[in-house]
UniProtKB/Swiss-Prot annotation:
Binds 2 divalent ions per subunit. Binds 1 potassium ion per subunit. This is S-adenosylmethionine synthase. One of its GO terms (biological process) is one-carbon metabolic process. The lineage of its organism: Bacteria, Bacillati, Bacillota, Bacilli, Bacillales. L-methionine binds at residues 58, 101, 252, 283. It is an enzyme of class 2 (transferase). The gene is metK. Pathway: Amino-acid biosynthesis; S-adenosyl-L-methionine biosynthesis; S-adenosyl-L-methionine from L-methionine: step 1/1. It catalyses: L-methionine + ATP + H2O = S-adenosyl-L-methionine + phosphate + diphosphate. Homotetramer; dimer of dimers. Residues 101-111 are annotated as: Flexible loop. Keywords: ATP-binding, Cytoplasm, Magnesium, Metal-binding, Nucleotide-binding, One-carbon metabolism, Potassium, Transferase. It holds the Pfam family S-AdoMet_synt_C. The keyword Magnesium applies. K(+) binds at residue 45.
Length: 398
């Protein structure tokens, strides 16, 4: 029997990938600032390369943070603890070039927003977006996490690749690594099987390729992928270049915000272009993307669509979003216009409203900086809540 199959591929990277090192460092600095100053304005960019890290950006805060210490602790936690790994938290140089947030931006964002549980309506209305831009959120019912299967499995495999290294199961692995998963969909657009898995992991110099391939299948792939998705036709490419000894920042420079598709939906949904890491929640690139995921996930969980993509757009200094758009890809149980109306009535999508709704002024961001910001099963994130399901059901029936 033949059918019209469709293949879709997504990728993830481990926490030791250079770009992910940069994301984690930026968010570790953000978290450290938010611990003492929840009203801080942070736009923190990190560059990592051989033997050094450069921290730049704009930070306005009333607290003090030992940035080099935070950088070194983050690098140590990732696993770059010896010079032979190509990067060493003890001997690397840490350079800083930090300015304050531009007063031209600050005056349009927030004049007097104070950190307290009960933010007044006047303060919410007075808090404008930190920039113009468009953000997307997405959800699908093809997995229990409301994420597309290719990116979900990619993250699970990347996390497992890191875990077997840190737990000493495969102690010859090194921190840098990448995973890619190709899923085959059937004629009903449901996941049917895994067509291809690609794993590349940095490793010690004296390990044979055949051992790496066998160990990664046994300890990473088979324990992670749900039974029935791998079959005799599934293709495996494990360290297909044959050698991956030089890795991390020694192999490639890393920059904050270079893995925006890994951070979101693996290319399965659209992306507005703005990254997340290193940005405080007044930056709608981050907070509005979280809110859009929150909206989309609750719509799908309410049974109002099998898939849902939400677009939000903002103008700098303006509180209300300039547009809200919803696409259910012809899977909606009610019209998209009804969904937009229900969302407008039940979600406060102004920047300060999002911060209040999702309680975003806390140091919760470093844990999002590797293995995805959405659909996580290992950490609890406020934009993954399903507390609007009944509200949305009632709203579309009214």
């Amino acid at each position: 029997m033949t059918y019209n199959k469709r293949l879709f591929t997504s990728e993830s990277v481990t926490e030791g990938h250079p770009d992910k090192i940069a994301d984690q460092v930026s968010d570790a600095i953000l978290d450290e600032i938010l611990k003492d100053d929840p009203n801080a304005r942070v736009a923190c960019e990190t560059t990592v390369t051989t033997g050094m890290a450069l921290i730049s950006g704009e930070i306005s805060t009333s607290t003090y943070v030992d940035i080099p210490k935070v950088v070194r602790e983050t690098i140590k936690g990732i696993g770059y603890t010896r010079a032979k790994y190509g990067y060493d938290y003890q001997t690397m140089a840490v350079l800083t070039a930090i300015d304050e947030q531009s007063p031209d931006i600050a005056q349009g964002v927030d004049k007097a927003l104070e950190y307290r549980n009960d933010i007044s309506e006047e303060e919410i209305e007075a808090t404008g977006a930190g920039d113009q831009g468009l953000m997307f959120g997405y959800a699908t019912n093809e997995t229990e996490t409301y994420m597309p299967l290719p990116i979900f499995l990619s993250h699970q495999l990347a996390k497992r690749l890191s875990d077997v290294r840190k737990d000493g199961i495969l102690n010859y692995l090194r921190p840098d690594g990448k995973v890619q998963v190709t899923v085959e969909y059937d004629e009903s657009d449901k996941p049917k099987r895994i067509d291809t898995i690609v794993v590349s992991s940095q490793h010690a110099d004296d390990i044979e390729l055949e051992q790496i391939q066998s160990d990664i299948k046994e300890h990473v792939i088979y324990p992670t992928v749900p039974e029935g998705l791998i079959d005799n036709e599934t293709k495996f490419f494990i360290n297909p270049t044959g050698r991956f000894v030089i890795g991390g920042p020694q192999g490639d420079a890393g920059l904050t915000g270079r893995k925006i598709i890994v951070d979101t939906y693996g290319g399965y949904a659209r992306h507005g272009g703005g990254c997340f890491s290193g940005k405080d929640p007044t930056k709608v690139d981050r907070s509005a993307a979280y809110a859009a995921r929150y909206v989309a996930k609750n719509i799908v969980a309410a049974g109002l669509a099998d898939q849902c993509e939400v677009q939000l757009a903002y103008a700098i200094g303006v509180a209300e979003p300039v547009s809200i758009s919803i696409d259910t890809f012809k899977t909606g149980k009610v019209s998209e216009a009804q969904l937009v109306e229900a969302v407008r009535a039940n979600f406060d999508l102004r920047p300060a409203g999002i911060i209040k709704m999702l309680d975003l002024k806390h140091p919760i961001y470093k844990q999002t900086a590797a293995y995805g910001h959405f659909g996580r099963t290992d950490v609890l994130l406020p934009w993954e809540k399903l507390d609007k399901v009944n509200v949305l059901k009632d709203a579309v029936q009214a």
